[in-house]
Amino acid sequence: MVQLGIRTGRGGFSEWMKSFFGQREKNWNIELIKRNREKMARIFLVAIEQYNIEVSQKEVVDKNGVHIAEQLISPEGFKLVAGYHTDSISEEREVESNYGIYIQNLTTTVYSNLVIGYNWQTGVIVIVKVDAELNSYSDIYVFSKQNVFKAKHGWFSDVFQIYDRSESLIKNLLIFLSFKNRTTFMVDAEMDGSLRDEKGGSILIYMRQTQERADFVNFFRKFAK
């Protein structure tokens, strides 16, 4: 697996801070949330169907030359939450001023929206990379206890991390210490559409999912054991 592509309105500590300082409740577009939930379900079903087609056509051979049949996924029993991944891209630019030329360091945060399916019964996590409007999807990532070396959730940072499993113990340890061989993502209780791109479009999926997020956190803690 690979890393998918700043936190805002997340649960946990930030929710406690809001209640402590008595922040006013937001006005939410309930119809849009309902519509986005329906679109999440539809796009998840389509992604699973496409994944199963690709898996059935793929031939996998282990190190001993034995052919392995990839397991197909049934969409039944999956619960869904909206999430996202961030990548920080740094670049240097030369800037002219009255005092000469100097180097300016610029950091751009790139967001990747995710529909995250999880199944309590099978212990499987399916991550589908989508656009903010939930009109299309691209990459699909499937995780089970068998193909994960380690999973963890940072309470303070609120980042969910899944590390790839290797057949070598040494490689597993190196993967755990590496930033490259892991999948990281976040699941916020609230994503209110306040983050906008330069064209005015929504950056994150508009969603309020307090109870759903709490259920996913409980699932992930069990998944990580």
Across the structure, where does each feature detected by a protein language model lie?
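N-terminal functional modules and adjacent low-complexity/disordered segments of proteins
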Residues: M1, T8, G12-W16, I73, ...
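Anionic N-terminal interaction surfaces
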Residues: V2-I140
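Phosphoinositide-binding peripheral membrane targeting modules
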Residues: G83-Y84, S88-M186, D192-K225
